[in-house]
From Swiss-Prot:
GO terms for molecular function: glycine reductase activity. Heterohexamer of two alpha, two beta and two gamma subunits. Component of the glycine reductase complex, together with components A and C. PB is substrate specific. Pfam families: GRDB. Belongs to the GrdB/GrdF/GrdH family. Its EC number is 1.21.4.2. GO terms for cellular component: glycine reductase complex. In the first step of glycine reductase, the substrate is bound to component PB via a Schiff base intermediate. Then the PB-activated substrate is nucleophilically attacked by the selenol anion of component PA to transform it to a carboxymethylated selenoether and the respective amine. By action of component PC, acetyl phosphate is formed, leaving component PA in its oxidized state. Finally component PA becomes reduced by the thioredoxin system to start a new catalytic cycle of reductive deamination. It comes from Peptoclostridium acidaminophilum. The active site is at 350. It catalyses: acetyl phosphate + [thioredoxin]-disulfide + NH4(+) + H2O = [thioredoxin]-dithiol + glycine + phosphate + H(+). Disulfide bonds: none annotated. This is Glycine reductase complex component B subunit gamma.
Length: 438
């Protein structure tokens, strides 16, 4: 009997190509199995083999979703696999979204079973858990020794068409799908047993867990932008040179509040990024590529907006827990309200950074202040629940393009900000991604 054919999808880091400096690499087939693919092959060697590894840079995938997916599918198809394994992505947001997108597409478009793995707080998990099997892993590559065997075991079960049990038994993230199953005891007996456990204060597990919905009403549109006070918030980690508050480069435990009164431009002499989730060179060269102080200051002088708030709030969103993101926003939103801020422009960079940003968007908007989220990976913003979303240019430079001249780049940034102001002046009843014209 021939062995089960497995294709492995991984990002540039696990392929050994490089880190953030290679995150824009286009899809390709590895000439030989990278170590992680070889480890997977060793785990399943008795009944299967990894016949090929397909690689794509995280940023390239995030910025070219449709094209990247289609090219990767063609590469996978060329191996004629029986199953596809993607990842594990742990808590790497862009990687998680890419791995889950590939997993779903392989199932839906190629008709081939597929599985991926990631940390439960990875934005890819929230986006795709209803559509794909996602094995729950630790939040970093330190968990590889447990994650890969769990994925390998599940993949073999899936490839052989064996019955798949519930999420607790099989180790995948709960999908919110109900299915019939047979139990030895009647429902009445199980219900009484559960009630007794509850009354005793013992742990029990419901058989019908309810999904959690957390949507926020969109803030009312700004009627007269020429009189509005606009504040900037970012999960992109822009801080004064030297990072005086020591905001962590990942999994931030704090945020900063910075005074920009009298500042027309965020130069490299005074500002930098503390963000560790993408190549920092572009933001360090010009922090306006992440928060558009220069353009908003021009608009303030021209009377397009009433006032740019003298403070902006910043944290690093990559790997930052949703609970922390909410806590930060709950705290500084009180100050925004007290300071009479009318609207907020919030910017984000990478995948988990976008999740953090969108989480802050919702907390700010609970106060009634309308917020527009400028982000490159817009599907994550939608999944988390931001109401007004404006597409950005690229993950490391959402409001800029280093390939342009200074004047051209600033003109591009102005178009993005104009679109953001348009969004803030538009009444919306549901989540809306405003079409880019730049």
């Amino acid at each position: 009997m021939s062995k089960i054919r497995v294709v492995h999808y991984i990002n540039q880091f696990f392929a050994g190509v490089g880190g953030e400096e290679k995150a824009d690499i286009e899809p390709f087939i590895a000439e030989s199995l990278p170590p992680v693919s070889q480890s997977l092959s060793n785990l399943i060697k008795d009944e299967a083999e990894v016949v090929g590894t397909v690689v794509c840079g995280d940023s390239y995938f995030g910025e070219n979703l449709v094209e990247a997916k289609n090219r990767i599918l063609e590469m996978i198809k060329s191996f004629n696999p029986d199953i596809v394994v993607a990842g594990p992505a742990f808590n790497a947001g862009r990687y998680g979204v890419a791995a889950a997108t590939v997993t779903k597409a392989v199932q839906d478009e190629l008709g081939i079973p597929a599985v991926t793995g990631m940390y439960i707080e990875n934005p890819g998990a929230d986006m795709f858990k209803k559509y794909a099997y996602i094995i729950s892993t630790g939040n970093s590559a330190a968990a590889m020794r447990t994650a890969l065997p769990a994925m390998a075991k599940f993949a073999m079960k899936l490839a052989k068409g064996e019955e798949i049990g519930g999420p607790v038994a099989e180790g995948y993230i709960e999908r919110g799908i109900r299915f019939n199953m047979f139990k030895e005891d009647r429902g009445a007996k199980r219900a009484v047993a559960m009630l007794v456990k509850k009354l005793k204060g013992e742990e029990y597990e419901t058989e019908y867990p309810m999904p959690s919905f957390d949507k926020v009403e969109p803030g009312k549109a700004i009627k007269d932008m020429s009189k509005a006070k606009i504040a900037i918030v970012t999960s992109g980690g822009i801080v004064p040179k030297g990072n005086p508050d020591r905001i962590e480069s990942s999994s931030a435990s704090k945020y900063g509040k910075y005074d920009i009164q009298g500042i027309d431009d965020l130069t490299s002499e005074g500002w930098e990024t503390a963000h560790g989730g993408h190549d920092p060179i572009y933001a360090n060269e010009d922090a306006d590529r992440v928060i558009p102080v220069d353009v908003l200051r021009d608009m303030e002088k021209e009377g397009v907006i009433g006032e740019l708030h003298r403070y902006f709030y910043s944290t690093t969103g990559n790997g930052t827990a949703v609970a922390s993101s909410k806590k930060f926003a709950e705290e500084f939103t009180k100050e925004l309200v007290a300071d009479g801020v009318d609207a907020v422009i919030l910017t984000s960079t990478u995948g988990t950074c976008t999740r953090c940003g969108a989480s802050m968007v919702k907390e700010i908007e609970r106060s009634g202040i309308p917020v527009v989220h400028i982000a490159t990976v817009t599907p994550i913003s939608l999944t988390v629940g931001a109401n007004r979303i404006v597409p950005a240019i690229a993950i490391p430079h959402p409001l800029g393009n280093p390939a342009l001249s200074h004047e051209e780049e600033k003109a591009l940034r102005r178009k993005i900000v104009e679109k953001a102001l348009e969004a803030l002046q538009t009444e919306v009843e549901e989540q809306t991604v405003f079409e880019r014209n730049y």
